[in-house]
Structure formats: structure tokens, C-alpha cells
Amino acid sequence: MTSTPTELIRNFSIIAHIDHGKSTLADRLIQTTGALSAREMTEQVLDNMDIEKERGITIKAQTVRLNYKAKDGKTYVLNLMDTPGHVDFAYEVSRSLAACEGSLLVVDASQGVEAQTLANVYQAIDANHEIVPVLNKIDLPAAEPERVKQQIEDVIGLDASDAVEISAKTGLNIEAVLEALVTRLPPPKGDETAPLKAMLVDSWYDSYLGVIILVRVRDGRLRKGQRVRMMSTGAVHTIDQVGTFSPKLTPQADLGPGEIGYITAAIKTVADCNVGDTITDDRAPATEPLPGFKPSIPVVWCGLYPVDADDFEKLRDSLAKLRLNDASFHYEAETSAALGFGFRCGFLGLLHLEIIQERLSREFDLDLIATAPSVVYRLYKTSGEMMELHNPADMPDGSVIDHIEEPWIRATIMVPDDYLGAVLTLCNERRGQQVDLTYVGNRAMAVYRLPLNEVVFDFYDRLKSVSRGYASFDYQMDDYVEGDLVKISILVNQEPVDALAFIAHRSVADTRGRAICAKLKDLIPRQLFKIAIQAAIGGRVIARETLGALSKDVTAKCYGGDISRKRKLLEKQKEGKKRMRQFGKVEIPQTAFLAALKMDA
């Protein structure tokens, strides 16, 4: 089969806030163009991870090729890239957008524009996309299409007068969306005779085929048996299979300019496939790679340890397999005195961390402990040397530190004005600095600069609870700012517990220290001797709780008789306890770790 001429191809992605009906619209487009038979249609076809279906969110970007016979009688090939809407997966979004020429902007006609819609639209505008606004859920009684169109124009600055009004659930007006794609989006550009340049959009692991690579061809052709080279790593592979998604893998003879498809090349490790890399022909390589690719930088780090130490190897293999699918996730081995062997893992954000943890426990059946999430600090020593600090336990002695810088973010929060006061109070409690506050209709848009350290723990949950779930939140990294930060160590029976150490601003150090000590007092089982649970900054103890001893009734078998007999036994017990306190080891149960780490917020 010869590849499709470029003027009949349209590559587009769907951008939307969480829950505005993006995956449902994708389902309808697949159904209308008949890419899957009625028997194979399931809800959210493109969300193929269980977690994605359960939480109703899209995590991995997915693609599908649709054939559509338009009103002008020509049959067009539409390549749909379904992108995630959540802020943590902005990296997946940026790659999908780089592979397309246009976007459908889906906005819920009853909710209006939300924070993540904005973030993704700006990314699409940066990628020079033609954007077609689509109002979804028009069948709801609460839908206000005119108000939302006005809002799109006011907030984003897009002309929404000819926005397509649809209901993805009932399938209303889906044809109009397909026509808009064909008439309003530009075809891809590309030169078939130039040296091969293809962008590696995503890669995942298949136990039969090895690594499957999702590619977007810019120039040249990709065909079976061709030897290709990855430009960033220099690895050379021979292509076994070329094809497209419908959403099932469908082999083709070759892929030409503008087409999106997959290749397999018996690649064993995904480490060879850097997402966003340029693939070129080994014999006639392109001179320079495609622009528009930035490697992802982890923002949040935490330690992952197996509950059962024997599972360490299993955890290592599982992480390696996940890394195959998720290029934005990093890990390195580390050890902890309290938790044994484990890994220090880097994530794009908290939802990303939660999902990786959940995938490890589901797909690989692992029981894990995660230490408190921390951000990357920059530590400047008195010697003038700068080190990056991923783990609070590695922080050197205070005397050698000149100053510490912490990452700040720029957060955009959209909230109905009834809840604005509570949201502003929350931001101020978290050391936020207000940058901007504007009103659009009855919704306020607040822009704040916040230290990432304060956001990492539970900012998102608190934001949702103070705004009754109406606020939406999006952020991008700003820069590093010097801060008065201290490391708080937790000591149990005079022994520091490395897994519980954390870094906080001096102003909140005391309250956090007290809270953790009080929590641990309830969680650690009582021993036969008294235990002190302390929080300390350097050598200064800032909080203490004492866990009382269990006492065994040693005088139980003395009946009556002389008091000195009882006293002798009690003295003996006291001696023993004193000795135990000196040499006794306190085992902290795993449940205590989990609960203490959860409450760090």
C-alpha cells in the first residue's frame, strides 16, 4: 500500500481539562468513522490502563488512525492523539502536540474554561497549532454555550463564534467535528525525497515484539527492513514491522511524510528510545535533529522501599519495566538504615507519584513504603560548591552550608468568587506571593508564586476542600529562590530515623515537628522501657513526646510477708529497665511509617 498524500492527512490532538469529555469524544469519533466494530467498542477505548478507567483520567497519550469520507467526496486520514489533561502529564501533552498541526479544544458547556484548559491551550499555541473550539455536554440542562463562548474569547483570546456544539455522550453533531477537522486544520508539510526524519513520540514495551515505538514522520519514508539510527543515543536498529493504529496494531508497507504510526525493531530496552528523539536513516542520515524536544526533569522525589526486603530484586525489575513505558520517571538505588534497600525515584508531580505507586502494586503485585515526597534543593556550601539535594537525609552539617535555594512555582488557580477568600488564605499560609488577580464573569483567576515544598504535600487536597471541589489548579516551574530552610530529624530513643527526616521552612518547623512526634506516639507500640520521641534541628530539640513503659507485675507471686522481698524484686526490675533503655532497639512498625509519612502534610 502506498502511503497517503499529505494533503489528505490531518493530525490533531484533543486538549481539555479533566472530565470535560475528551476520551468520550475520542470514542465517538472512532465509532462514527467505523474504526472499530460495535462489538469491540468499549467505554473510553483509548484509556487502556485499569487505573485510567477507574479514575476517569488519561495518563498515557494514545493514538488512533481514522478514515473519514468527507462531504467533498475525498477520503481523509485523521490521526488522533489523545492527550492527558492533568498538570503532571504536561510532558506527554507537549510531545503529542509537537506531532500534530492542530487541536480540538474541548470545553464543558456547563463548566467553562478551567486552569488546565488554559495551560494546554497555551502549549498548543506555542506549537503553532490551528485550534478548533468544541463545546461538549450541550445536552445538559446547565449548559450555557453563549456564556462559555464569550469566556473562551475573553480568557484565551480565541474566536469562538463558530465553535462546534456537541454532546459526545449522545453522539450529537459528531459529523460537524469531523468536517471542521478536514476544513479548518492544515495538512502536514513534509518532503518525501529528503533524508528520513521521524519524531519518536512515545514508546512502550510489549512482551512479544519488544519495544513498540510511536513515530511521526516529518521527511522521507520509513519501511520494513530499513536500518535506522536514533540521533541522541546513536543506537542503530533494523525495522521489523511498520504500521498504524486503528486502535489495534495494523501492519503497513511503509509510512510517508505526515503519517503517524508505529515501528518495532526487536529493541530490548526502552532506555535506547528517548522520547522526543529524532529517528533517521543510518545510511543517509539527516544533518540535524528535529526541534521542539526537551527532556523531562523530575520535580518531586521520594524513596520507594519494599515492605518485604526479599522483594528488592522484584522491585528493581518492575521499575525497569515501568520506565519502558514512562520516560519521565527516574530512579536510582539507595539504602536507608530504617527501611533497608530501596530506590530514590523522581516524578513529575504528586499524581504521577501516586499512579506509579499504584501501578507497581497492581501490575507487579508489590507492597511498598514511600517516604515523604521532597523537592530538589540547591545547597551552596561555604567552599563555594553547589550540590543538588534529593534526599533530606543527605543534608550535610549546618556549619558547612552557606545558603539553600528552593524551587518556586507559578500557580494559576481558577475559582468561583464565593470561595476566593478561602483560597487566598490557603495560598498565604503556604508562603505564597500574589502576582495577579482577575475576574472573568463570576470566576476569579488568581496567579500566585508558591514554594514547591509547600505544594508537594497536600496543597491540592486542601485547595479542593476549601473550595468545595470547584477550584482548578495548574502550575509551571518558576525558578530557585534562597530560603531559610532547616532539616528536621526525628529521633526515637535517641536514634535518628533517616526515613522520617524532612526539610521545612523555619517558620513552620516547630509545628510540623510537634505534629509528627504526637502522631508517632500513637503509632509506635509501647515497649518495656520508656521511649523518648523527639524532633530536632541540628542539636536543638524542638519537640518531645514520651512513650510510657509497659510494666510487668513482678510482685504477683509474693503473698503477704515482708515488704523487703517485694522491694528487692522491684529494684531488680528497675535495673533491668535501665539496662534495656541503654541497649534496647525500638522496632518501628511499617504501619507507623506509612501513617507518619501521610501526615507530613
From Swiss-Prot:
Q: Where does GTP bind?
A: D19, H20, G21, K22, S23, T24, N136, K137, I138, D139
| SUPFAM superfamilies (alphabetical) | EF-G C-terminal domain-like, P-loop containing nucleoside triphosphate hydrolases
Protein's membrane topology: Peripheral membrane protein
> Pfam families per the record?
EFG_C, GTP_EFTU, GTP_EFTU_D2, LepA_C
Enzymatic class: hydrolase
Q: Tell me, which GO biological process terms does this entry list? A: positive regulation of translation
Q: Which EC number applies?
A: 3.6.5.n1
Task: Tell me which residues make up the tr-type G domain.
Answer: 7-189
The record, for SMART domains, names:
EFG_C
Transmembrane listed as a keyword: no
CDD domains recorded: EF4_II (cd03699), EF4_III (cd16260), LepA (cd01890), lepA_C (cd03709)
**Which positions are tagged coiled coil?**
none
The record's family statement is:
Belongs to the TRAFAC class translation factor GTPase superfamily. Classic translation factor GTPase family. LepA subfamily.
What does the function comment of this entry state? Required for accurate and efficient protein synthesis under certain stress conditions. May act as a fidelity factor of the translation reaction, by catalyzing a one-codon backward translocation of tRNAs on improperly translocated ribosomes. Back-translocation proceeds from a post-translocation (POST) complex to a pre-translocation (PRE) complex, thus giving elongation factor G a second chance to translocate the tRNAs correctly. Binds to ribosomes in a GTP-dependent manner.
**Name under which the protein is recorded:** Elongation factor 4
Originating gene: lepA
